[in-house]
Amino acid sequence: MHYVSTRGEAPALGFSDAILAGLARDGGLYVPREWPRFSAADIRAMRGLAYPDLAIRVLTPFLGGEIAAPVFERLVREAYATFRHEAVCPLVQTGANTFVLELFHGPTLAFKDVAMQLLARLMDHVLAERGQHATIVGATSGDTGGAAIDAFAGRSRTDIFILFPHGRVSPVQQRQMTTSTAENVHALAIEGNFDDCQGLLKDMFNDHGFRDRVSLSGVNSINWARIMAQIVYYFSSALSLGAPDRPVSFTVPTGNFGDIFAGYAAKKMGLPIERLVIATNDNDILARTFATGEYRTKGVFATTSPSMDIQVSSNFERLLFEASNRDAATVRRYMAGLKQSGAFTIEAAEIAGMRSEFDAGRADMDEVAATIRSTLANSNYLLDPHTAAAMHVAADKAGAVPMVVLGTAHPAKFPAAVEAASGVSPALPAWLGGLMTFEEKYTVLPSDLKMVEDYVSRRARAAR
C-alpha cells in the first residue's frame, strides 16, 4: 500500500512516512494509490464485531504490512479504551427512519477523538521505532485542538503546537486546549479566523527549510490517518442497520470535508451507501459549489456552529482528485486558481460525477436553533448546533433508506447556543466538571508566519 499526492509532484510514500509527513511536499494531500475493497461477504463477516475488532479489520489493509498485527491491535484497543461508552460510537434512533451516530463519547466530547486517539499512538510508535522526535503543528476551529492536545499530551517523542482563532471558539473548546499541564503542549491564540490559522499551517509545511529543521508533522485532517480512522464508524453504523444487504445514507456536518470524505472512502471500499449529504451552516461554500459548479470563497461569518465556520475546505482537494480520475494536473490548476483569485470552476463532467455521489444543503442559525428545539420536543433528544445543522438538512433529503446523521459533538461543548435555542442548559459530564475552573495557559500571536515559526522553533525539542 502506497500513498500518492493529489498534486502529483511529491514521491509516493508508505503508510508510516505518509502519516509523519501530513501534507505532501508539493502542497498536496496523500491518498491511497488504490482503495482496498471488501466484498458483500466480507462485510457480512464483520457483523457483531466489537468496535475495536471492526477497526482492526477495516484498517489493516491501509498499513501495507508496516506495523505488525499484534502491535496495531494493541494500539487500536488502547485508543478506544479511552471512550466512555461500550459501543464507542453508538447509534440512537430519533425518528422513524432517522438515527444519530454519537461520535462524542471520547475524552474531549467530539468526533475528533475517534481519529486522534489512534493517530497519536500510531505516530508515537513509528517515532519510537525510528528513534526520532517530531513537532506537531495543528490548526483548529474548535474541536481538533482539544482532541489533539488530549491525545498527544505527555508523549515523549512529540511537541504539539495548536493554533486557534482568538475569541472564536467556545469557552469549553478553549479550556480543553489551554488547561493542559503537559510540558509538550503549546496553545497559540491567533489574531484572525480559522482560515488564517489553516493558512499559517499550510505555509509552515510549504516552508521546507523550517519543516525540516523542526521535523514538522501535522494532525489536521490533511493527515491521511485522520480520514482513515473515521472510515470505521461508517462501517459500524451501516452494519447495525443491515449492511451490506440494506443501503444507508449519511448526513454530515461539514467544514473541512474530512469527515464526509471518510464516508466516500467507505463507499469506495464496498460499503453500500446510497447518498452522502453535506450539511453546512451560513458559511455555505460547499453547498454553493454543488449548486453552481464554482468554488468561490467569501468572508467567514461567525455562527453558533463554529467548527463549520470555514471557507477553505482542505479535504475537498481529495475529492477533486478522485472526480478528475486522479488527474493531478487538473487539481494543481484548481488549487492555483484558488490561491490567485479565491475561486475555480469545476469541469462539467467532474461536478456531475460529484453530484451523483453527494447532496448538499445549508442551515442558517435560526434553522439550527429551531431544529434543536423541535428535536428535543419530538424525540426528547438534545443536539449540539453542528449536529442540528445536519439534522435540518437531513430532513430535506430523507428517502426510503435509513438516514444516519453524524453527531459530532456533545451539546455541553456549546452550552450558550443550546440553552438559547432550547431553554435547557446542557451539563458537562461529571468527569469533566472541573474543566472551567482550571488555570489557563496560552499565548496570543498575530497572524504572522515568521513570528509563529520563531515561537515554534524556540520551543520544539526536535529543533535542538
Residue ranges: model-predicted function:
Residues 1-464:
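PLP-dependent amino-acid enzyme catalytic core
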